């Protein structure tokens, strides 16, 4: 039978299993011999056990498991030897003896184990033995075996390295300098072995080797952790000895993987205070790293860490003598210069980190933030970038960069102080400019930032011009209507934040805003001009409030209404009708209420403009009814007209109502007109209501006549009920022309017609309306109000 091929994983498991079994057998024998005090035999079994670490067949992961199993067993040997030496056994002989082990791997592991026990028993030998051990380990140059051997050396000597604060005879026991030299040498040798791994084996296994190297990196990094744990390593020693030694090794190894990992390791394991004192050498080293190293990530990690340190409430902050921002700014520029092929998005990422640093460490220094933006503009100019596509990585990073000042200051006026914010904004393509403009305006609205001067209005409008005017690079096809409406509504809401405490300044602000919005095209102005008109009306009311302090207030009001008139006229030119009609009516009301010199003429002009729009521009019957109802309602509220002006306007309303196309619309509009002759007011009667009962009756009779002409029975009855309600209203207002007899006749007419209607949901509604009307009359008849009319003789 042919044997089945094993997978590499199964092969590894089998090899590891066999090695572990051998370790168990040899360690069992070693322990038996130790229990019988047969030390030489025990060392022979230990040597056999360690012989398993000579293999080249295991993967790093499997080798690590084997190494851990053997380390545990060696610990047993170390404890035994420590006890023996405490009882007076000679260590020196043993230290000499294990050097005769046949193979170098077992020999060095045993030497380290015995050497550590020797140092614990005779501290005066520490300096020589440590030096001896770290040098002897050079005997193993196979990368995997050498790395684990040196890791064993580092772990075993962890508690015996000389450090600060312990009584020592420096000649023999060594001091902190010896510890630093020991770990730095071990680190350098381990790094060389680790780097050399990539050159072993066939080139087709390169990816696999890189993965294995990634798995082993922590062994090299442990040296740096060990250095950071030495209490004797203060800022001065770190600067002069430790960092210099590490950086020399990192830069000289010319291996991208090692450089990137070790630089990040330095940032992580040493304290922030050390980094602050060694920024320049560290960042200079960054500029010298291999071209394939992602320097951006290293620098960003350091910046972010120091920014957090500066921001800590319980921390000491950044010392005044350390110009943190300047150092990073200069060194980042050097790094970018040294890497011509650095991707644009990485360059911008570095600026993002710099701006974060400026914001967190120097919140008051707007100039630092602007310096970062200026540098970015210069870089883009060199790269000849323009209209950066929304989908690109550069655009995403640039968006991050520009959002930081917006989000941190939460005040657009501070952002406007950044001279290079707008120039950088212009590098975006149309889509990105639009979305960033929305982002900026949303921030203004969220934080209610008031814009108080013309210059500020100009600056913001220019910044977000993509939302306000057509752009040369905008797409040919029309935007999505919903999105467009959302964007323009944002702009419309923003207008309400254009407000100065000084009314004259406010007028200039509105004028400036109109210049920008006026160029927005027909699609935009329907959203942007109405709020501007309302802001103008509000300003006129402010002048009225301040009339005691400003003797020219009336002329200024006239100017404002002229401004509003021009602005509304722009909407008419854009072929809009209903919107300008409403704005004219609102203006007429405002002018009448404020009562400045000439206000009647202004109000009359605004009313007649509304009429012209109604007659010339509105053709849809539904829209016509809505418009004439609005005109009548507005006019009824006004009390600034003399009879000379009031009479033609109310007559015009009645005429327009009777000319509507559809009979039901005519009936409703004419009955609404009745109110003008009752509660309308003019100056001739000192603002009192007209109470023209006869004219009211004429309107209501005309409405009934029109209702009679309707062909649809349901609609006819519905109109009768509506007109009945009008009659009741005027009867209760004590209009003598409306009598109980009139009410009885109309109720009787409705009662006769209702049963003839076809059964439907609509008929049900009509019945309900009529029933509610009768209920109202019944309750009034049964409990008459003391001042109200008496419903005597009403037939229900």
Swiss-Prot record:
Positions carrying Phosphoserine: 7, 783
Record-level GO cellular component terms: cytoplasm; cytosol; dopaminergic synapse; early endosome; endosome; endosome membrane; glutamatergic synapse; late endosome
Highest taxon in the source lineage: Eukaryota
Region (Interaction with IGF2R cytoplasmic domain): 500-693
Disordered: region residues: 776-796
Region named Interaction with SLC11A2: 438-796
Major subcellular site: cytoplasm
Modified residues (Phosphotyrosine): 791
Tissue expression per record: Detected in striatum (at protein level). Ubiquitous. Highly expressed in fat tissue, testis, brain, kidney, thymus, liver and pancreas, and at lower levels in heart, intestine and skeletal muscle. Detected in oocytes, pre-implantation embryos and at 6.5-12.5 dpc.
Keyword Membrane recorded: yes
Keywords: Cytoplasm, Endosome, Membrane, Phosphoprotein, Protein transport, Transport
Keyword Membrane annotated: yes
Residues covered by region (Interaction with SNX3): 25-44, 205-215
A GO BP annotation: negative regulation of protein homooligomerization
Pfam families noted in UniProt: Vps35
Gene3D superfamilies given in the database record: Vacuolar protein sorting-associated protein 35, helical subcomplex Vps35-C
Membrane topology per record: Peripheral membrane protein
Gene Ontology MF, one: D1 dopamine receptor binding
Subcellular location: Cytoplasm; Membrane; Endosome; Early endosome
Entry function: Acts as a component of the retromer cargo-selective complex (CSC). The CSC is believed to be the core functional component of retromer or respective retromer complex variants acting to prevent missorting of selected transmembrane cargo proteins into the lysosomal degradation pathway. The recruitment of the CSC to the endosomal membrane involves RAB7A and SNX3.
Recorded family membership: Belongs to the VPS35 family.
Subunit structure: Component of the heterotrimeric retromer cargo-selective complex (CSC), also described as vacuolar protein sorting subcomplex (VPS) formed by VPS26 (VPS26A or VPS26B), VPS29 and VPS35. The CSC has a highly elongated structure with VPS26 and VPS29 binding independently at opposite distal ends of VPS35 as central platform. The CSC is believed to associate with variable sorting nexins to form functionally distinct retromer complex variants.
Record protein name field: Vacuolar protein sorting-associated protein 35
Protein species of origin: Mus musculus (Mouse)
């Amino acid at each position: 039978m042919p044997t089945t091929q094993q997978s590499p994983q199964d092969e590894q498991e089998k090899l590891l299993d066999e090695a572990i079994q051998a370790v168990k057998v040899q360690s069992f024998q070693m322990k038996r011999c130790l229990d019988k005090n047969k030390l030489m035999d025990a060392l022979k079994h230990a040597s056999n056990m360690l012989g398993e670490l000579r293999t080249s067949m295991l993967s790093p992961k499997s080798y690590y498991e084997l190494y851990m199993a053997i380390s545990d067993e060696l610990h047993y040997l170390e404890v035994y030897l420590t006890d023996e030496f405490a009882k007076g056994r000679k260590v020196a002989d043993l230290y000499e003896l294990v050097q005769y082990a046949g193979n170098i791997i077992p020999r060095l592991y045993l030497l380290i184990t015995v050497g550590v026990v020797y140092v614990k028993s005779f501290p005066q030998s520490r300096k020589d033995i440590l030096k001896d051990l770290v040098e002897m380990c050079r005997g193993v140059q196979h990368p995997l075996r050498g790395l684990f051997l040196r890791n064993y050396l580092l772990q075993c000597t962890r508690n015996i390295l000389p450090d600060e604060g312990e009584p020592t005879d420096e000649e023999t026991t060594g001091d902190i300098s010896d510890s630093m030299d020991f770990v730095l040498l071990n680190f350098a040798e381990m790094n060389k072995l680790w780097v050399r791994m990539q050159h072993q084996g066939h080139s087709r296994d390169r990816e696999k080797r890189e993965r294995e190297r990634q798995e082993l990196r922590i062994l090299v990094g442990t040296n740096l952790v060990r250095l950071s744990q030495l209490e004797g390593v203060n800022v001065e020693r770190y600067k002069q000895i430790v960092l210099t030694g590490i950086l020399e090794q990192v830069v000289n190894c010319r291996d991208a993987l090692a450089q990137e990992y070790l630089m990040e390791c330095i940032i992580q394991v040493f304290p922030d205070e050390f980094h602050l004192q060694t920024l320049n050498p560290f960042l200079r080293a960054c500029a010298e790293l291999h071209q394939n190293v992602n320097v951006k990530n290293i620098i960003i990690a350091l910046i972010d860490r120091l920014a957090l340190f500066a921001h800590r409430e319980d921390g000491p902050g950044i010392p005044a003598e350390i110009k943190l921002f300047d150092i990073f700014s200069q060194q980042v520029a050097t790094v970018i210069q040294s890497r011509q092929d650095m991707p644009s998005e990485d360059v911008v990422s570095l600026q993002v980190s710099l701006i974060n640093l400026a914001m967190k460490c120097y919140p008051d220094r707007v100039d630092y933030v602007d310096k970062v933006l200026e540098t970015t503009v210069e870089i883009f100019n060199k790269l000849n970038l323009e209209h950066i596509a929304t989908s690109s990585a550069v655009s995403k990073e640039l968006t991050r960069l520009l959002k930081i000042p917006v989000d941190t200051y939460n005040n657009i006026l501070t952002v406007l102080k950044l001279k290079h914010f707008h120039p950088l904004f212009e590098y975006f393509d149309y889509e990105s400019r639009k979305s960033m403009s929305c982002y900026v305006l949303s921030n203004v609205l969220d934080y209610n930032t008031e814009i108080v001067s013309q210059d500020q209005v100009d600056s913001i409008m220019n910044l977000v011009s993509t939302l306000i005017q057509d752009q040369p690079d905008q797409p040919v096809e029309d935007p999505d209507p919903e999105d467009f409406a959302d964007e323009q509504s944002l702009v419309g809401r923003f207008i309400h934040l254009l407000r100065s405490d000084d009314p004259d300044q406010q007028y200039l602000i509105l004028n400036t805003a109109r210049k920008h919005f006026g160029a927005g095209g027909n699609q935009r102005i329907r959203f942007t001009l109405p709020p501007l008109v309302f802001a103008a009306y509000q300003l006129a009311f402010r002048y009225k409030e301040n009339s005691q302090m400003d003797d020219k207030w009336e002329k200024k009001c006239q100017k404002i209404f002229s401004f509003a008139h021009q602005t509304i006229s722009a909407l008419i030119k854009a072929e809009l009708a209903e919107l300008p009609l409403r704005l004219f009516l609102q203006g007429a009301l405002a002018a009448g209420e404020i009562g400045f010199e000439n206000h009647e003429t202004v109000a009359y002009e605004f009313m007649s403009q509304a009429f012209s729009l109604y007659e010339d521009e509105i053709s849809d019957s539904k829209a016509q009814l809505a418009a004439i109802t609005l005109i009548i309602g507005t006019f009824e509220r006004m009390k600034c007209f003399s009879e000379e002006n009031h009479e033609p306007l109310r007559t015009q309303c009645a005429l327009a109502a009777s000319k509507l196309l559809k009979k039901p619309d005519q009936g409703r509009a004419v009955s609404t007109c009745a109110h003008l002759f009752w509660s309308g007011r003019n100056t001739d009667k000192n603002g009192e209501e007209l109470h023209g009962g006869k004219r009211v009756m004429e309107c209501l009779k005309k409405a009934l006549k029109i209702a009679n002409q309707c062909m649809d029975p349901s609609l006819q009855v519905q109109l009768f009920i509506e007109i009945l309600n009008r009659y009741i209203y005027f009867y209760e207002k004590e209009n003598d022309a409306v009598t109980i007899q009139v009410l009885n006749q109309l109720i009787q007419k409705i009662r006769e017609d209702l049963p003839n209607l076809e059964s439907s949901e609509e008929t049900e509604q009509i019945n309900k309306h009529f029933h509610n009307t009768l209920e109202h009359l019944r309750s009034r008849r049964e409990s008459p109000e003391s001042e109200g009319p008496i419903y005597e003789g009403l037939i229900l």
